[in-house]
Amino acid sequence: MIERIKKFLRTKFKPLLLLLVTVILYNGWTPHLGIFPPTFYDFAFNYYGFVDILTFLVIIVIAYKNDAFKKIFDIFRPKNLLFILFFIVGGNIFIALAHHLYFQMTPALEAFPEHSIDLANYFARTPFWTHSLDLFVIGPISEELIYREYLYRLFDKKCLACFVSVTMFAWVHTGFTYSFFLYLPISLVVTLAYHRRKAIGESIALHSSINLINTYLPNLLSFWVF
């Protein structure tokens, strides 16, 4: 038993700590979590863009120091570029078809996740550059570090890590509601992009592309941003 604890501390404690620290830096300064004193949240609200960028830079430095981006430049190899293109096109088509089926089978009042409503409210009260930065840079990079890079490091079996990653990403965004099945195909596609060779650059590119298509090309693919 003692040896197992020592082994856990030696191999799994660091990625668990990285995951928790990144979650706090990414989401911890939002008021509904109540982690920090009210005065901090007042400051964060008044200087939202500054706090957002500052915490993101800390996330990037921590990730870089812990080799999260060691395969990042491999993304420019022809084989990997073709893979990303395939996943962007094929993945988005799969998601659109899955969501079409979802909306056919789900009661109207249950179809739209609260997270999507929160995002719509967020768009209305923040400048264009701020929510664009969140949607296409900060959000995808931070969430891929949390749900793919660090979460995968906690498991010795890659297939188990894939299952947990897919489930956790969808659940955190929706809870166990009907809309869980709205986010599930998105989570599956992005996780599989990472799963192939555990390269975070590819899942970030796919994550950002899904947000981009969903935000600016709603008539092409009808699914909700994550």
Curated annotation (Swiss-Prot):
<feature type="transmembrane region" description="Helical">
    <location>
        <begin position="169"/>
        <end position="189"/>
    </location>
</feature>
<dbReference type="InterPro" id="IPR003675">
    <property type="entry name" value="Rce1/LyrA-like_dom"/>
</dbReference>
<feature type="transmembrane region" description="Helical">
    <location>
        <begin position="43"/>
        <end position="63"/>
    </location>
</feature>
<dbReference type="Pfam" id="PF02517">
    <property type="entry name" value="Rce1-like"/>
</dbReference>
<dbReference type="GO" id="GO:0080120">
    <property type="term" value="P:CAAX-box protein maturation"/>
</dbReference>
<keyword id="KW-0472">Membrane</keyword>
<keyword id="KW-1133">Transmembrane helix</keyword>
<protein>
    <recommendedName>
        <fullName>UPF0177 protein YbdJ</fullName>
    </recommendedName>
</protein>
<keyword id="KW-1003">Cell membrane</keyword>
<keyword id="KW-0812">Transmembrane</keyword>
<feature type="transmembrane region" description="Helical">
    <location>
        <begin position="81"/>
        <end position="101"/>
    </location>
</feature>
<feature type="transmembrane region" description="Helical">
    <location>
        <begin position="206"/>
        <end position="226"/>
    </location>
</feature>
<dbReference type="GO" id="GO:0005886">
    <property type="term" value="C:plasma membrane"/>
</dbReference>
<feature type="transmembrane region" description="Helical">
    <location>
        <begin position="16"/>
        <end position="36"/>
    </location>
</feature>
<comment type="similarity">
    <text>Belongs to the UPF0177 family.</text>
</comment>
<dbReference type="GO" id="GO:0004175">
    <property type="term" value="F:endopeptidase activity"/>
</dbReference>
